[in-house]
Curated annotation (Swiss-Prot):
Protein name from the UniProt record: Lysophospholipase nte1
Functional summary from the UniProt entry: Intracellular phospholipase B that catalyzes the double deacylation of phosphatidylcholine (PC) to glycerophosphocholine (GroPCho). Plays an important role in membrane lipid homeostasis. Responsible for the rapid PC turnover in response to inositol, elevated temperatures, or when choline is present in the growth medium.
Intervals, Lumenal compartment: 87-108
Gene field: nte1
Region described as Disordered: spans on this chain: 1-24, 308-384, 523-544, 757-776, 1501-1522
Matches recorded under CDD domains: CAP_ED
UniProt keyword annotations, A-Z: Endoplasmic reticulum, Hydrolase, Lipid degradation, Lipid metabolism, Membrane, Repeat, Transmembrane, Transmembrane helix
Renumbered ranges of motif DGA/G: 1370-1372
Amino acid sequence: MADGVTQVDSTGLHSFSPSPSLSSSSSLPAVALSLAVSASAVTASYSISHLPPPPLPPVPTTMAGWIGWVFSFFFQVIPSVLYWIITFSTITLPTWLFTLFSMSLTFTMNFTTLLLIVLAVVSTISWFIRYRFLNMYSRLPPEPQRKEPQVDLFPDVQEGDSKPGLANYLDEFLSAIKVFGYLERPVFHELTRTMQTRKLIAGETLMLEEEKGFCLVVDGLVQIFVKSMRDGKSDTDEELHHLGAESSDEEHHIDGKQGYQLLTEVKNGASMSSLFSILSLFTEDIQLRENESSGSSSSSIALRAARVPNSIPTSPRGVMDSPSLGFQDHSDDTSNMITNGELPSVPPLHLGESRTPPSGDQHHQQHHESRKHSSRKRRKSVHPDIVARAMVDTTIAIIPASAFRRLTRVYPRATAHIVQVILTRLQRVTFATAHSYLGLSNEVLGIEKQMTKFTTYDLPNNMRGAALDRLKDKFIKERDRLGSEEVTKGIALHNPSAGRRRRSSSFLRKDAALQAKLMTPRRAATVVTPESAPAEHDTYGVSPGDLLSTIQSSRFGPRYEQPPAKLQTPLAEKENTHFRLPAMQARHTFRRQDTMDEDGLFRECILDCIMKGIGLTSSTRDALRKSNHSGEASPKLLSYDSRRQKAIFTNNAFGFIDPYEGSGDGETESLMSMSVTSAGGTSPVINLREELRNDIEIVYFPKGSVLVEQGERHPGLYYVIDGFLDVGVPIVDKGEDLVGVSKPAASKGSFPTLKRTTTANSVGAGGTAANDSRRRKQSRKSLYLIKPGGIQGYVGAVASYRSYTDVVAKTDVYVGFLPRASLERIAERYPIALLTLAKRLTSILPRLLLHIDFALEWVQVNAGQVIYRQGDESDAIYLVLNGRLRSVLESPGNKLAVVGEYGQGESVGELEVMTESTRPATLHAIRDTELAKFPRSLFNSLAQEHPGITIQVSKLIAQRMRDLVERPVTEKGVERSNAGSVQTATSTVNLRTVGILPVTAGVPVVEFGNRLLHALHQVGVTNGVTSLNQAAILNHLGRHAFSKMGKLKLSQYLADLEEKYGMVLYIADTNVSSPWTQTCITQADCILLVGLAESSPSIGEYERFLLGMKTTARKELVLLHAERYCPPGLTRRWLKNRVWINGGHHHIQMAFRLTAEPTHPETKRFGTVLKQRVQVLQAEIQKYTSRRIRQTPLYSAQSPFKGDFHRLARRLCGRAVGLVLGGGGARGIAHVGVIKALEEAGIPVDIIGGTSIGSFIGALYARDADVVPMYGRAKKFAGRMGSMWRFALDLTYPTVSYTTGHEFNRGIFKTFGDSQIEDFWLEFYCNTTNISKSRPEYHSSGYVWRYVRASMSLAGLIPPICDEGSMLLDGGYIDNLTVDHMKGLGADVIFAVDVGSIDDNTPQVYGDSLSGFWSVFNRWNPFSSCPNPPTLSEIQARLAYVSSIDNLERAKNIPGCLYMRPPIDGYGTLEFGKFDEIYQVGYAFGKQFLEKLKSEGSLPLPEETEEKKKLQRTLAPRRASI
């Protein structure tokens, strides 16, 4: 303290002032400063402690005082801290550094120490890089495989007894009359107002042939028996009356099976009447054939029309007994029969045989006295020898025959609709079952053959001679001009008025409709055409042999005579002149242009014969006129949109014959027809005849041309002018599908849409026909010939059936063709056409088909309803008519596994019925389904009388048992790894309806549906494909759209569409709460949930609605991408919360515009609008914030076959192409060359599966679906694997394997990164061997590198990979070529590439013992003749691949598998350095193999060959102007 002065200031604080000597000293400034600070601190503390305390400021008692005290404290402390920091950083720290650096240190160590230090540093760095930088693959977030979704099996709410009382009665009654289709309220009341009920006590019998009406069981159980054919027949009334009178004798008779056999048991809500008996009730007063003799004079027609009452039984008795007579004999026989007025007594028929009953002698005028007797006989002939017995006390309801007769008179259009519905179900239930399932082809085909006797009408005599020769000359000249190739398509005669009709058809139709509305009933019932000149017939002096006098006179007769004065009005006379003027002009034109009018007269004559053949004659029109005074309460007859017929007609040889384009709205058309009907008495006949005259086409087909193919919907009616048509059936060689109902009937590699256009020579080797003939090896069996004057396709075209036969031109044939659209217009305006067909069908029905029709039950089940449960007694076989069923196996532990799914045309339950065992699984309906129930009692009855049926069903069962036996071992378990494959295999087959549902509002489902529809058309769906949206449905329903009947009408319309088309797309383009969205969900076999990939993956409102409906249909997710790229992990985010997606997912590239508004915007609500806006904003923000590798796609599908919509279309219709790549180490590089050859050949790949190196190459191709990135990445990986340094650095102590597997993991991870299998553009899977559970596993989700690495893990070389506690090794140890699993995924054609090593099978003769020394010496001895024994490693390898070799041999024989093995045996497993060489070998082999397939015609691809280009040109054939 001597060097400074300390003083105290006025505040009581000490201050220190350094002395001048200390301040001037610069040697130790820091020391001086520190001393000064220390002295100051000591002095201050000493002074403060000894001096009296100064008066301190008062302690603050307020908040302001505390704040001031804190501020004063901080103003003193903070400056001192800052001062210390500054001094330390500027003075103290530099001083320390200067002292440290001025020091000198010396370290001494030897080289060993230095080396150890360096090794430690290097090891530390390498460990950090190896385990913290290069093994990023091990630090990925865990993403386990996605579990297979559980099977949805909701409780059956409809199980158990029905509701008691009145509700039970109504429910059972309504379920029974569903067979009539939708009924309007007046029609329903008309049917039920005279309904009667009847009580049957247990054991009471009922003679069904004596019951005059439609019978159904309301409560109880009734057994239906049939008289056995083996014990003789009982036809007389006395026997039947005695049988029905003595119930006790009858009971004993039936119980003892004395001559009767049980057909079926009828329970609550089922009908006791067959479909044919219902038709007979509607068609009592319908003629079988037109009375041609009465058509010679108009007066006779007028007289007969005046005498015809409301109900006349005028049906010939002996028409069915006459064989194929000459055409001139038909008129005489028929006229005599019709004059007699007796109805036919249809006898019991054996398999096509007929018995001739005696003809009646009553006269036509005595019909009133004989009506009851005739009706009773007719009813007996409709269902003879049928007896019903009540098992318990039963209540039945009977709708009497009088109700049906009155319904026919009061509501003829509704009657025709009911008849059409019954005819449709008759074909779907009875005919289809008998033909396809029971093998009763002769009985079914015999119906069409016998129908020709009713439809044969000859052309007039003067049109057969010189006129026909002139017609032939025109075609011969044109044929010579065109050449043989073009002629094979058929030549149509030029129709100059066809174009004018199409342009003005809508106007002409409305004009003629209004015209007919004002005409008298007499005039309206007359058909007038522009070519007919009524007044000038005698003026021109035409001879009686002229054409106009031979055309049906009834068309002109009423115009010659004076009508009754009370019916004639001046207005009608004025209106009639409107039609007479063109008639006079046409007559003069015939004088001037004989050739042109002769063609028109040919069309007139052909149309006359066709209309008489289908029952549209003058007498039927007159009879219809009396009762056709209603119609406002009847819906439109046709149950499908006629405008959609265009898509079908363009696919046949008559694509140029457009359907009626001017019809406009279908409902408007129906209303116009009904209003005209009620006003004028008939439909607008004049306009209809004019339209049909222009629709008639005269076509020439050369010998061998195919006019109609089996299974095709009839294009129309063919009237044979000259030549012969051969009707036959193709005979499939043995070894093919026996029945055709157990497998989808799709020919591989063919295009049915093109196949329908092969109207050329079917024997020729062109295009699809040649491929099909080679593939199926069919021969043909001729059934009967259609001669000139005959009509082909009557039943099929009028009733819209599919053809059971092929129709081939036996000779050069000239036919008149009337399109099916024209027939639909006829049936719509003249229901008598359908009634006539129904009458003819009931008259020629064989007894066997009648009994089958009685026993077959039409069953309708709701979505989710259980048909039978596992363990129930098997009482019936079920055939799917419409809808879809799923069979579910309930295993111990309440685990459910899908056994199979059954679509339209398939059957289930034969094995249990034949073996009388219990049901092996539970069967439930996926959606609303129509079934044909084939009871076991009917099967037993048929088996006793017709063993051929038993043989047919036994073949089906044997085929299914063979499939079960040959099912691979890998599919017999129900483990997680393969349960999904079984479900997928059955779910992708025979899909008939696909629902397209958006995830949320704003998804462009309409555009998506249109593109998918276009792709399905190009892929070629059997029988075509159509799409439905709300606009199409509203257009069809019209005024019934929002009524209860509209639902029934809609269900029938949708059922007809599913029968008509091979696939129907339901596009849900409405809001969530609309009924159409619900319909799309309930009608779908498969539901496609469409979402935008870049939008929010949250659950959408449509999905919530879908879940609320509890549908069990297959659900698939479709993600729409703006670019052909999927970021890693995107798909997993979508699938994570959607456990209900049980059908996989698809990535589709589709350019679209993001919009927040749906296609049909719903009601504007603030919450909904706000949510949509937020979603759009999220999507827009995600565009710029998401990490994406590239903003534009590097690889796009430039070839159409690689289009995403085509891939989805092939998956939906079961025509996917699979690629299976086998394992083999470096030999797998050949896979790259084979894939390139496939792309160059134009073969699309939809599913890829691989093993070992095949999984690596397959994953590369599935990622981008392009060869270019696959080639680059594969070559880079081969370079890494070919480096010996990497292999050497990865060596480890061989406790588990020789290497650690790190370098192998790195090579695979650098190739795939963090991508997941779900993100791949193509569907991909790889297989591994689970050595922990000793089973194969298939992986289709999770990290790619992980499961590809597991599939490539050779035992001993690389350690197994751990997955959920299990160890996975190379999948090739069990199955090196997974063709069977690929088949289970739904692939139709599979390319299997095998690159595995071939074992040395040289016989070994080294003896019973072996010395190792001798083995080594023998291996090095060049002169030894003994083969080298296998080494220990070779023996272990052969043991490991024993199972794989067995599966490989089985895979080669799987149908649809194309086995390929490139010549790569000379390359080793680890020779990755020979990449280019092995790649070229595979590429060359692939090109050679595919060229061979192409030359053989078995290349399954949509290739544009010259033959198919010719076929495509026939889609729009040219009209020959001759």
